[in-house]
Amino acid sequence: DRDSCVDKSRCAKYGYYQECQDCCKKAGHSGGTCMFFKCKCA
């Protein structure tokens, strides 16, 4: 589901979201970004 990475991957304060992107890609999304320290899959 679209927000399955929110709890699994933490988002750093300053734009580092590789963990979020990797999680989203594994879940079948094109990637992910961080919004308010939460991982959102794109």
UniProtKB/Swiss-Prot annotation:
Keywords: Disulfide bond, Ion channel impairing toxin, Knottin, Neurotoxin, Potassium channel impairing toxin, Secreted, Toxin, Voltage-gated potassium channel impairing toxin. Disulfide bonds join C5-C23, C11-C34, C20-C39, C24-C41. This is Potassium channel toxin gamma-KTx 1.6. It is found in: Secreted. Belongs to the ergtoxin family. Gamma-KTx 1 subfamily. It comes from the Eukaryota. Blocks Kv11/ERG potassium channels. The presence of a 'disulfide through disulfide knot' structurally defines this protein as a knottin. Has the CSalpha/beta fold, which comprises one or two short alpha helices connected to anti-parallel beta-sheets stabilized by three or four disulfide bonds. One of its GO terms (molecular function) is potassium channel inhibitor activity.
